[in-house]
Structures are given as C-alpha cells and as structure tokens.
Design a protein with these regions (language model features):
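Mid-protein regulatory/catalytic core that forms ligand/cofactor-binding pockets
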Residues: 27-125
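Homeobox/homeodomain signature
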Residues: 8-11, 149-151
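Basic, Lys/Arg-rich alpha-helical nucleic-acid-recognition elements, primarily the DNA-binding modules
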Residues: 1-6
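Long, low-complexity intrinsically disordered regions in eukaryotic proteins
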Residues: 9-26
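Charge-dense, extended regions
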Residues: 110-171
Length: 171
C-alpha cells in the first residue's frame, strides 16, 4: 500500500488546499489587502486523493473530506478511483463518499450530486478490499483500535475501517 507517512507539513498543505477550495473552517482569513488575489484553488480530486493517502491526519481534516466530495461531486472521479486503487485507499474513499451522501441528504437541492455519488459508491463497492484499515489514523494505540472494532459506526464496519466518526455527525 503506497501511503504517505506522518508529516505535519503535509497536513498543513492539505489544510491550506481545503481552504483554497472554500471548505468551512479552513478558508484563509482575509489580510485586508483588496489588491491581493485569492490563493489559487486546488483540484479537489488531487486534494481528496492526497488526504486519503496519508497515514495520519488531524480529525478536523478527515471530517472536512465529505464536504469536499459533496461540494465537488462533479470532480474527476476516474482519477480519484484510479489513485485509490493504486494506493489501496478505496475503503477510505468509500466511507468518505458514504458520509458525503448522508451529508447531502440533509438538505434539498442535492439530488443530482447524490445520484452521482451513489454511482461512485457502487463502483467502490466493486473494488472494496477485505482488510482492516483506519481512517487516516494509523498511529492509534492498539487499545483504541480494539475499542473501535466493537464500537465503530456500521458504515465504518462495512468499509473495514477503524474510526468513531459517525456519518450522521458530519456537517
């Protein structure tokens, strides 16, 4: 599996990329200079793929990923799926897409996005890997992993992930 090791610099870069995409909680604060152009937006497919390839990320970044998936449901999914398979992160991606679908179902006007995400989720089910993983939290102590095996949300168990992030709590 081609995952990226822990790196505070990588986490900061992903947080900055989330800000450039307009993600709530990550948007850059204005400096008060009207002539300053906004930072260039990143490709959401690249940001998502890079984040999912990290073995350890702050929970705030992981919780922002469903927003990226829902907000940019028209992203280049062929690239994302290819990268997920190459890096072995298809289960992580599947769980994030599931969370995005539940997030999108909370408000009106997302029908087209939800249809697209359901198609992506179906493709991810076809390439799901039968192994245990974490949701970008590889450094969890074994005692916490044991607890998560017994207490994770059903969606996390479906995707073989050890996480307590509940799709119903993501907003």
């Amino acid at each position: 599996m081609a995952l990226i090791t822990r790196s505070p610099r990588r986490a900061r870069a992903i947080a900055a990329a989330l800000g450039s995409l307009g993600c709530p909680g990550f948007a850059q604060l204005p400096l008060g200079f009207e002539d300053d152009p906004p930072p260039p937006a990143q490709d959401p497919a690249v940001v998502l793929s890079a984040a999912l390839a990290c073995d350890d990320l702050p929970r705030s970044i992981v919780r922002a990923l469903p927003w990226v998936v829902l907000e940019y449901a028209g992203m280049d999914w062929e690239f994302v799926l290819k990268e997920a398979r190459r890096r072995g992160t298809q289960n992580r991606l599947g769980f994030i897409v599931t969370m995005a679908e539940q997030l999108g179902a909370q408000s009106y006007g997302n029908e087209e996005k939800l249809t697209r995400l359901a198609e992506v989720e179906e493709r991810l089910f076809d390439i799901r890997v039968d192994r245990e993983d974490t949701l970008c939290q590889e450094s969890l102590p074994e005692s916490e992993k044991t607890w998560l095996r017994a207490n994770r949300p059903k969606e996390a168990a479906l995707w073989g992930l050890l996480t307590d992030i509940d799709p119903r709590q993501v907003s």
